[in-house]
């Protein structure tokens, strides 16, 4: 059996390795133009899913940071804690750099004889893949290619009228296992630890404010309740 996965993304890399481990042949087909770079992006993975990834491939070099509790604040309540998510002595989830986990699974898949990477010059060629009888199963996990637009054009969309700004702050070393979410008048701001001296920041700012980078940095420092920032956000 040969399976085709459309899109060179984290979802398909994990799926491809899992299928290949069952001795199935997998082709990962992708258009270079559709590749998105996530240099500073971080993702949260639940403990169960993280354990599953490690169990699936024990040699995978995934650098993850445990988050034991999440605190929620609101600017309207003068930054008083609204509530906290916490499981005693158990990590709520793990934070990992997208680039780290992506590169880890890409390296694993590249060395697997049952997995092939195939580049297509234009996403319009995807129609020929649909009609290719050598594939028993075809899975499309891209959100914006020709096939998605053609076959999945009915969808519900929600426009939040905001832009997400991401970065990483270097700060004085502390015990850093608490994630923080602050609802500000500009939009929600999250501080997501990735080490004892580095924290990922995600600030979703409503478009109506049209803030410059220097103003955004000043707001992050203003709403920062925990960290002693060493230098400008990267």
Which residues does each predicted region cover?
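Residue-level signal for inorganic ion chemistry
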Residues: 53, 105, 191
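N-terminal FAD cofactor-binding segment of flavoenzymes
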Residues: 38-74
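Short beta-strand/turn micro-motifs composed of small residues
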Residues: 7, 30-32, 74, 169, ...
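N-terminal Rossmann-fold NAD(P) dinucleotide-binding loop
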Residues: 12-13
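Rossmann-fold NAD(P)-dependent oxidoreductase module
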Residues: 18, 108, 168
């Amino acid at each position: 059996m040969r399976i085709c996965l459309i899109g060179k993304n984290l979802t398909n890399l994990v799926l491809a390795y899992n299928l290949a481990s069952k001795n199935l042949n997998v082709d990962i087909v992708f258009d270079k133009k559709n590749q998105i770079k996530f240099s500073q992006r971080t993702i949260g993975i639940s403990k169960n899913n993280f354990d599953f990834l490690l169990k699936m491939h024990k040699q995978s070099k995934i650098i993850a940071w445990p988050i034991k509790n999440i605190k929620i604040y609101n600017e309207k309540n003068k930054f008083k804690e609204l509530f906290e998510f916490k499981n005693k002595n158990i990590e709520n989830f793990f934070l990992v750099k997208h680039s780290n986990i992506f590169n880890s699974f890409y390296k694993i898949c590249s060395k697997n004889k049952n997995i092939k990477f195939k580049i297509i010059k234009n996403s319009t060629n995807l129609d020929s893949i649909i009609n290719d009888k050598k594939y028993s199963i075809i899975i499309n996990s891209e959100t914006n290619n020709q096939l998605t637009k053609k076959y999945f054009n009915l969808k519900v969309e929600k426009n939040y009228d905001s832009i997400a700004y991401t970065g990483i702050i270097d700060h004085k070393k502390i015990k850093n296992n608490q994630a923080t979410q602050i609802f500000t008048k500009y939009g929600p701001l999250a501080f997501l630890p990735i080490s004892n001296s580095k924290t990922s920041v995600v600030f979703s700012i409503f478009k109506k404010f049209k803030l410059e980078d220097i103003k955004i940095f000043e707001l992050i420092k203003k709403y920062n309740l925990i960290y002693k920032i060493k230098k400008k956000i990267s």
